[in-house]
A protein has these predicted regions:
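Residue-level recognition of beta-strand->loop/alpha-helix junctions
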Residues: 74, 232, 260-262
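Hydrophobic membrane-insertion alpha-helices, especially the h-region
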Residues: 2-23
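C-terminal regions of proteins
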Residues: 243-348
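Acidic-and-aromatic substrate-binding clefts and catalytic sites of carbohydrate-active enzymes
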Residues: 77-81, 205-209, 234-242
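Secreted/periplasmic serine-hydrolase-like ester/acetyl group-modifying domain
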Residues: 116-226, 309-356
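Alpha-helical transmembrane signal-anchor/signal-peptide segments
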Residues: 24-43
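Membrane-embedded segments
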Residues: 48, 52-138
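Loop/turn elements at helix/coil->beta-strand transitions in domains of secreted/extracellular proteins
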Residues: 42-44, 67-69, 95-98, 221-228, ...
Length: 356
């Protein structure tokens, strides 16, 4: 009996220490953790992608504008080869009528997609499950898997980084106290880049990238998601048309649509000098404009809004009000070019972070 109790105590301590020492990206982890705070079967739309998505689209403001519930299941630098795992994880708790997929994650090279840091941002932020194990096994060679199964092997030396441990626990505590993540998945920088560089490294699609897109679209077709919309968020430099055509041809085989919103600046009323904080990310002004445009598009094309309980509707109204207040403060700070980073778990009564 004493041995059993001792084993249990050791197991609890092991799990607690493993949890405390994990350090990937605080922002990315909170974007993912916030998803699990949403009531089951309460999301009409789930959006997948990387930082462009949660910098440029606000789920609470979309609810206020178009009446459907949604969540950015995203983290910075999310590679397209993980989108299947992200959708699989989503469908455990939600049955969205529509999945929206931002395509930037498909443009990473095969080497970049398989980087340990990108994989760990995802698998170290989700609960232990068959999906987590399968994702590790699909992306890591057998000889290298053990530190992914027992992540204390990776993070054991982090006990010295007390400042980051404290910031991470504070962020988790903030979201937990809110009940749900009030701004859902969100990040911005309070600036407007009036001198955006004219050139960024060109986006290219190779055979590997097309295969990843095709595999994901095929997986979507076999899933329980009713429909999928592939999009490209507005960027300051457009894709070459041949890559738009390659994406369209790939996803249309499965009955899905692709829309490149780089081509809708006039309709959205976006200006590069006012609505972006860097060439690839909208600021809060651009976020508000694009959220209204995309949510109208989704409402008109897919009509995803479902029936929800009065309690859930009340909470979404609270989220929209909280987000409006936060955006008002962020817009003022953006006009002043404060240049700080903010997240859904930030204390908006104080200045944001100097770095991401």
């Amino acid at each position: 009996m004493k041995i059993t109790a001792a084993i249990l105590v050791m197991a609890v301590l092991f799990c607690t220490v493993s949890f405390l020492l994990v350090q990937t990206s605080i922002g990315g982890e909170m974007h993912i953790r916030g998803f699990y705070r949403e009531p089951k079967e309460s999301l009409d739309v789930v959006l997948f992608g990387s930082s462009e998505m949660y910098a440029g689209y606000s789920a609470p403001l979309a609810y206020k504008n178009a009446g459907f519930t949604s969540y950015n299941m995203c983290f910075e630098g999310a590679p397209g080869n993980l989108y299947k795992s992200m959708l699989c994880e989503t469908l455990k708790n939600q049955s969205p009528k529509l999945a929206v997929v931002e395509v930037n994650g498909f443009f990473y090279s095969e080497e970049t997609m398989k980087q340990e840091a990108r994989l760990r941002k995802w698998v170290d932020s989700i609960p232990l499950s068959a999906n987590r194990i399968n994702t590790i096994n699909e992306n890591v060679e057998a000889k290298d898997r053990l530190p992914y199964y027992f992540n204390i092997m990776k993070y054991h030396s982090n006990w010295e980084r007390t400042d980051k441990i404290s910031r991470r626990i504070t962020a988790i505590d903030t979201i937990n106290k809110q009940g749900v993540s009030l701004m859902k998945s969100f990040s911005t920088k309070t600036t407007m880049d009036e001198k955006l560089p004219k050139k960024i490294g060109p986006k290219k699609l190779h055979d590997y990238n097309i295969k990843v897109i095709d595999d994901f679209a095929k997986y979507c077709e076999s899933s329980e998601v009713e429909d999928v919309l592939f999009i490209r968020m507005p960027h300051c430099l457009k894709l070459e048309k041949k890559y738009d055509d390659m994406i369209s041809q790939t996803v249309e085989k499965y009955g899905y649509k692709y829309v490149n919103f780089d081509n809708y600046f006039k309709e959205i009323q976006l200006t590069k000098s006012h609505d972006f904080y860097n060439p690839e990310h909208l600021n809060v002004f651009g976020n508000r404009k694009f959220t209204n445009f995309l949510s109208d598009y989704i409402k008109n094309e897919y009509n995803p809004a479902g029936e929800h309980s009065p309690e859930i509707e009340k909470k979404w109204l609270e989220c929209a009000e909280y987000t409006e207040n936060a955006f008002s403060m962020l817009e003022e700070r953006t006009l002043k070019k404060e240049g700080k980073y903010y997240y859904e778990f930030s204390d908006y009564s104080q200045a944001g972070d100097k770095t991401e």
